[in-house]
């Protein structure tokens, strides 16, 4: 469906678009094209004003029940009015008088084509739309947006590129076309903070209708923004909640969905047209309950995120619109062109609000000499922070590959620099309290982080990024450090330049960058299980196909050996984490054990009942040899003796030397096997 967004329906960015109420005199002076724009108001008016409304007679005048109180009456017959009273907004007949809006209410019936609407209908739609506050103009003030979505406070002023009239038109045309949309834009143009808000607005106005050419029944469904991490769900939902003029979730168009969500973050009065911020796993449980699907951080290739893309593509007729948002298409453009049916590609040009300077610090050691390379890197980092120092009261972020490196680099820097040092990553509790210290300190703060800070938390006073250019890529029973991709570099660099000018200092040669195929270093059971649930054909229906298909087929055989029905698997997928696929054998044994095992997966609390149950699975590991690492840590070189990766080598750390065998409880807990 080719449909352009008329100017009067732009979302108010409170910069050059404001909420506005049009007068009948203004309508009289408009061109026919401008007048026809009001025909589209019939869709939001039917949904939000006329739904369950009826005709009443109020002081002798026929009106809609949403205009005035009165006794329900039979509607009058309507021909051409003999007189128009613009001041009273009424059509006058010889036998009766009817309000502009009531006239339109009676004329806008199912199957009526909107290009047939005459001036009389359009004037009534203008009045109904004014009451809903759905119109906008280039003149106005922020306070005019109060109440547009039931908000008590005005919308935020947003000068970002994604809310310009040009971008709004382009995004609307793609949304209403029902084609899959791939949206890119530089960090700082407002992809995640503004585009979901814009799609919420379009959904509020026009969502649920099969066409905008004529009046039909509608099926209202919310928008969902699917994200890879809980931290992102909380961050972005709070940002959009505030920018729409709300201070509380209840009654707002914003809802959150993630596992073990606290009571205070549940919207008890959600809107049918609203937007749900959800983790990928919970998005999959009710994927077809949503009209518009937005998948963010596509470049990360989160496993469940990639599965959602595959499922949505397979069942695209069950979703009205799908948006894939990513910082860059460097790694995925060609695959998306082939994989998605007739995709639309939108790029929002623009950059961060403030300039970012780049500084390259050369490491003279070759990365193949890993230990020497890292020691040189740490020396270079100290020099760089001394030369390129954040101002007092500001902060810098050091990006390293792993949690262990966070502690290693913090210890090294603390001995050599007089600044406040902090660590932030996904396993750190009470990040907000750390940020309070960062924001309140008059000193320079240096935050050492994993790739977690690429997107999960916005640091408002950061002015400098120190990027080591590496990431730890987990693999079954291990993992390795790799150099980052261009998209990861763009994300890290974009952490500055939002509030003040920034500096991006990088310590790696750009030639080292490469795309990361995460699927080649993942457990593949989720691909098998969700393929069964959603009737995907493997491997061709997968967004990213593993290089080694033998592992995919071995995983399928292993899952089949559990002798668990597809129906039971689907229930397990919807209710439990199953961080180890073998836990499924325990979840089906009894509700009491399932509850305790679920609690262990969520909180880490290991009861004796759960431990004994997991030990019964005999997840055996053979210890080949060991070596002393430091005071209370020994590195054990082992071989996996169970599952798809039987025979795979693994490295396990333990507080004392072991020989023989150990049993795996989780990816971090191991129990020595008693040799007696």
Swiss-Prot record:
Name the catalysed reactions: ATP + H2O = ADP + phosphate + H(+)
Provide the leader sequence positions: none
Specify the inducers. Expressed both early and late in the viral replicative cycle.
Subcellular location per UniProt equals: Virion
Note the Pfam families from the entry.
DEAD, Helicase_C, NPH-II
* PROSITE patterns for the chain: DEAH_ATP_HELICASE (PS00690), HELICASE_ATP_BIND_1 (PS51192), HELICASE_CTER (PS51194)
SMART domains tied to this protein: DEXDc (SM00487), HELICc (SM00490)
- What Gene Ontology cellular component terms go with this record? virion component
Q: Name one GO molecular function term.
A: RNA helicase activity
Domain Helicase ATP-binding, residue spans? 172-347
Under the subunit heading, UniProt states: Monomer.
Function of the molecule: NTP-dependent helicase that catalyzes unidirectional unwinding of 3'tailed duplex RNAs and plays an important role during transcription of early mRNAs, presumably by preventing R-loop formation behind the elongating RNA polymerase. Might also play a role in the export of newly synthesized mRNA chains out of the core into the cytoplasm. Required for replication and propagation of viral particles.
**Entry's family note:** Belongs to the DEAD box helicase family. DEAH subfamily.
**Name used for this protein in its record:** RNA helicase NPH-II
Native organism: Variola virus
